[in-house]
């Protein structure tokens, strides 16, 4: 048979009996083609006989089995290669440790290149970040987490040292976070309500230790991909609800109603219940001096922030103005000068004992181990939120500063960091995008900026705690309110975006997460949001996306018939723009086949046979008979992988077609050897029609031999399969190839007859 290069000028052929040109390669060149060729060591000459792994789809002709003319060169090359490998083994082994060490300890990637200029930039950035992070840490600790102030300060001081060794994002600033502190605060309220003698430091220690352990094992197990599970809409819904909860809780302290709330016989736990409490009791029970002082601080912070935003348009350095630190310093001076606590009854932080912080905490003592069952759910929420928040920050910084960030390494760093700081009784610490961005804008060059922030925090803890004594509690609550408002600022923009884009599923996730958090609890909100997201992922992966193809009239192009017809109708154009081949159904599988979507493939194929489309409702009356289908072409160009369960389903589908005397053709099959080997072992390759291949190719999982001829079960193109169909019609062959039928398919078929 003579070779043909096209089908009516439109397609390539794969059944030429003329052998393609051969070429010679040295042994060194073999590795280049290791993904495309297998070799058989059991040949008669004990050499390496290469076997083509594709039917000319790679565009590389298979090499000649003969070694004439190049045997000596091959042997010499082998000897040279073996000698060089032997000599280089020692040097490679010696350098391996130094090459891989920066991957596991990222500090070794920047320490050798650290200079004085970078040091100066990190010092300035560390001072800038510490100026507002220390007041925030005190605010999170006292007004949100309800634990001693030193828990927050230790979290801010110690965590940067650990992250400086294991962290891989240079500008990342780690420390206590608002949402995390709120989860801890709700856990504290729940535990202390039933166990009055429990130490608040023990609660903080256990939550930090357990969450760190979860993160560490997740990183070791390489679960970093889970950072892609939760959608941005879910996180936005949760963070916005956290912002509202922070405002509600802070308002209680700003009106000095916290003690009155505790004294009531009924309990107000959920944010919605606290809103009802404020409506019922705030008008009559609020403390006037505290409310006035809180209002003044709130107005000052609002005005300074508005001024900063306007100035930043002209002077970017305005972002470094320490408005929060300025308000804290001024209120400390006012509190000291006018004796706010005794003269006006405004509560201050007051004296707090450092006795419980003079030694390291063991998270696994018996009293603390007993707290683990009660605090495990809160610890899991902390680990999840902390990881997602840190991942968001690291990805944003990585995009901005062209960094490659490994989620698994970040998990290990965050996990080990929290295990270490739990020994100090600290709050959980994670990365935050806002402060990390300010750190980068301040001139930070490495993680040493966070270390300097930690040093300044330690200095504050040892020298300036006497001034912390005078900070009014309501001022810290006002700072929390400002942070809560900032968490809500992006919500309107996100809602408008999803409404404009028709993202109603994202809006539903947002609403469910937000409402559940407000009306029930933070844990319930994040759990329901996660469950809904996972269900959506499963639904998405279980849906088959097969396409029915048709040729565009007057061209050699094939297109998705459903989309093409819909587009033609939408644009009021002539819908007679495609050509259907009589008795032939062309189906494209544009995705990997797995156990999740292979079952749906059966149903959609049945719908296509009955209606000519996969988008018509299955309850409608069939538009055509299944007997009209005589040929089915599967375009597997997008099927880059297939698991054994899906291969079994595909084999059953092909077997069912064979019983109806339908001819099956596979085209554009991936050159991936795993895909082809699995199709062969599942019996799929043996059950489909074949194209005549190179006579010199050996019988492998990709070829079959019959009467001296070699055949391949895979066609290069749809046109090649159509050409073969035309040849069969001319010959009058009406019996499809049926060499192989799986035992499982026979068993299932026969069992249905019993």
Swiss-Prot record:
Residues 140-146, 194-199, 254-282, 339-370, 432-450, 496-517 are lumenal. Residues 65-89 have a biased composition (Low complexity). This is Putative sulfate transporter YPR003C. It is a multi-pass membrane protein. Disulfide bonds: none annotated. Possible sulfate transporter. InterPro entries: S04_transporter_CS (IPR018045), SLC26A/SulP_dom (IPR011547), SLC26A/SulP_fam (IPR001902), STAS_dom (IPR002645), STAS_dom_sf (IPR036513). The keyword DNA-binding does not apply.
